[in-house]
Structures are given as structure tokens and as C-alpha cells.
Design a protein with these regions (language model features):
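Helix-to-loop junction immediately C-terminal to a conserved catalytic motif
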Residues: 43
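Conserved catalytic motifs of ABC-family nucleotide-binding domains
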Residues: 150
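Catalytic Walker B motif of ABC-type/P-loop ATPase nucleotide-binding domains
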Residues: 154-158
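Conserved ABC ATPase "signature" region
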Residues: 92, 107-125
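Conserved ABC transporter NBD signature motif
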Residues: 51-59, 68
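The feature captures the beta-strand-to-loop junction immediately N-terminal to the Walker
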Residues: 28-30
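Conserved ABC ATPase signature
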Residues: 104, 129-133, 137
């Protein structure tokens, strides 16, 4: 059971959530109902007084940062946008949990980055700066970075916010394809019931 208190205010009390492996799980509700707070608590971004979160059968607290990053990738609703970074450089950031300070980028890292750019259809953008991209392109690039982590669990906080309907559909289709083809477990927050269907 998960409970969250922020200051003197009890936000969540005795919540039980199970996310099935290999499925897409969506937390849905109106703005301000606590979806993002629940999501962030479930992945350890907000501290819960009762540490009771497990990921793949292992307590969240028992993971090192690198171990956790190899299991789970998280995309917040509005990621910090680097102004002077290319798409390829950003996607390479997803490889950090696998890199050692004394080693250069390995062939495997390059192959995984190429794969992530390919599956998200962002390969043609690899040399562009992040601020030059449209909203839908940016979101696909952030997902490519998350995929470069090779996570077993992809967690997204309102991945279609601020996108027009075409880009929303594009992102939802990409997530469905990743789940269907790779068995990637996806946990996300949405406030539009129609997107979850």
C-alpha cells in the first residue's frame, strides 16, 4: 500500500496498484486528481513514508541509480529541453547507465541508438538541434532516448500533452507498437479517456 503526504496534506492513502508485465497500463482522470503524484510515487520520484514499491519483484530502494535506469525509463510531462544538443546526442544520453567512465562509446551503444532513432522514425532528425523540432518530433525523440536505455518498463507522464491530434495519435500508435512487437511494459498517465482506448 502506498501513501503520500506533502507537507501536512495527505495526498494519497493506502493505494494498491499492480502493473502487469508486458502490458500497457494507463492511469486516467481529470486534471488535479493525483494521477501524476501517484505515478511519481510509484517510481520513487516522490518519497512515500511507507516504502512498499517493487519493480520486477525487487524493492525500489534496493536498486542503485544505474540498475534502476536499466530497468525503467521515465519521461516527465515536460522534460527539460537542452538548447545546444542534437537529437543524436540526446538519444545517446539513454546509454549512460551502461557506460563506464574509462570507456569510449561502444559499437553496441551506436547500434542501440540507431535502433531507437529508427523505431521512433527520427533518424532523419539526428543532426538537428532539439529546439528546432516540432512538439511531436520532440516527444518521439524523448521516447527514442528512453528506448536507448533498453528499459523493461517505460513510464510516461501525459506523453501527448500540448500535441495536436495527429501527433497524439502518432505517439499512441508508437507506444502500442513497442508493446506489441517488443512486449515493452508501459505505464502512463492520461487525462483523455479516448486516448486510453
Amino acid at each position: 500500500q502506498l501513501s503520500v503526504t506533502l507537507g501536512d496534506r495527505h495526498i494519497l492513502h493506502d493505494i494498491n496498484v499492480s502493473v502487469p508485465v508486458g502490458k500497457i497500463t494507463t492511469l486516467i482522470g481529470p486534471n488535479g486528481c493525483g494521477k501524476s503524484t501517484l505515478l511519481r510515487s510509484m517510481i520513487g520520484y516522490i518519497h512515500s513514508p511507507r516504502e512498499c514499491v517493487t519493480i520486477l519483484g525487487k524493492s525500489l530502494q534496493s536498486y542503485s541509480q544505474n540498475e534502476l535506469a536499466r530497468q525503467m525509463a521515465f519521461l516527465p510531462q515536460v522534460p527539460n529541453m537542452p538548447k545546444d544538443m542534437t537529437v543524436e546526442e540526446l538519444v545517446y544520453c539513454g546509454r549512460y547507465p551502461y557506460q563506464m567512465w574509462w570507456k569510449n562509446t561502444a559499437k553496441e551503444d551506436r547500434e542501440i541508438v540507431d535502433y531507437a532513432l529508427g523505431i521512433t522514425k527520427t533518424n532523419h532528425l539526428r543532426n538537428q538541434l532539439i529546439p528546432s523540432l516540432s512538439g511531436g518530433e520532440r516527444q518521439r525523440v524523448w521516447i527514442a532516448m528512453a528506448l536507448a536505455q533498453q528499459p523493461k518498463l517505460l513510464v510516461l507522464d501525459e506523453p501527448t500533452t500540448y500535441l495536436d491530434i495527429n501527433h497524439q495519435l502518432e505517439i499512441m500508435e508508437l507506444l502500442k507498437r513497442l508493446n506489441d512487437e517488443q512486449g515493452l511494459t508501459v505505464l502512463m498517465v492520461l487525462h483523455e479517456l479516448t486516448q486510453a482506448v
